[in-house]
């Protein structure tokens, strides 16, 4: 088996249907499998999957186990040499997996590959490529300084590359993360203690610590309907702060300046 596509679903039945249809089309010339994990949805996601896609492996959790654990369960059932963590509110292109697989085979030391993500209206989603959110980098993001001075404060969204350039980046978004299954298992998969918005940062960073290079690959485009960039409320800011706190406590030390930066950012937001 070449590729296992892991889709974790929670109450997005219509998006899920579109997503699975697009993945099936993209896998037509690939020895691949689709694994859908449902986190105890209250809509008819599972009924739809059984009716529309009876050959797709469906795992039904009896409780909502969250993003990290749900995906870890899915990967545990995968048999592909490569895996792709894919959000259910995405639509991949027909050429997505063929192109990403070809790129992966050329880059012997790749860790995780992400692709060009756009929203439902065709706008590029900047979280497609990011840098390690050091305290200052996180501050420039949370205050919006990166928008005012993108050349000076552009590290959060890896502005050393434009959206139409392929190259090395540090952090990729959990909506689309392509990697070898062996690497996923070596680093322990997603940390199940992670807060929302830190799980993909943590996994990307673990790949780097493992001596790998992460890549943004621009030559295929994936629609992500509910991207992080579309969320602009107080709840998002609180979760972002929690995510940064978790990441720094795990990998670095949380300094006084980090706490000040985060509090200032929330005030200015």
Description of each model-found segment:
Residues 22, 38-47, 63:
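A conserved acidic beta->alpha catalytic loop
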Residues 162-221:
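A short, conserved alpha-helix in the catalytic core of glycosyltransferases
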Residues 83:
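Short aromatic/hydrophobic "clamp" motif used to bind/position activated sugar donors
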Residues 205-269:
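Active-site-adjacent helix/loop segment of glycosyltransferases
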Residues 21-31:
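Short, acidic, metal-binding catalytic loop of nucleotide-sugar glycosyltransferases
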Residues 60-78:
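Glycine-rich, basic loop-to-helix element that forms the pyrophosphate-binding segment
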Residues 132-169:
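Short, flexible, basic/aromatic active-site loop/helix in glycosyltransferases
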Residues 91-127:
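Conserved donor NDP-sugar-binding/catalytic core segment of glycosyltransferases
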């Amino acid at each position: 088996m070449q590729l296992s596509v892991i889709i974790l679903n929670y109450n997005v039945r219509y998006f899920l249907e579109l997503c699975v249809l697009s993945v099936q089309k993209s896998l037509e010339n690939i020895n691949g499998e689709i694994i859908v994990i449902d986190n105890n949805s209250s809509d008819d996601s599972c009924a739809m999957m059984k009716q529309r896609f009876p050959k797709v492996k469906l795992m039904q959790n009896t409780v909502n186990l969250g993003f990290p654990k749900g995906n870890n369960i899915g990967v545990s059932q995968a048999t592909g040499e490569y895996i792709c963590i894919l959000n259910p509110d995405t639509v991949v292109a027909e050429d997505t997996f063929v192109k990403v697989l070809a790129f992966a085979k050329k880059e012997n030391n790749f860790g995780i590959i992400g692709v060009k993500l756009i929203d439902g209206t065709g706008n590029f989603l900047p979280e497609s490529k990011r840098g390690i959110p050091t305290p200052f980098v996180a501050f420039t993001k949370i205050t919006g300084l990166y928008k005012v001075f993108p050349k000076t404060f552009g590290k959060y969204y890896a502005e050393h590359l434009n959206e139409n350039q392929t190259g090395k980046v540090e952090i990729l978004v959990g909506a689309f993360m392509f990697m070898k299954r062996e690497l996923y298992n070596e680093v322990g998969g997603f940390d199940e203690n992670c807060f929302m918005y830190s799980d993909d940062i943590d996994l990307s960073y673990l790949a780097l610590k493992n001596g790998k290079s992460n890549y943004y690959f621009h030559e295929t485009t994936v629609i992500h309907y509910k991207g992080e960039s579309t969320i602009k409320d107080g709840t998002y800011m609180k979760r972002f702060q929690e995510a940064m706190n978790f990441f720094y406590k795990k990998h670095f030390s949380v300094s006084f300046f980090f706490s000040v930066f985060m509090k200032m950012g929330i005030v200015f937001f």
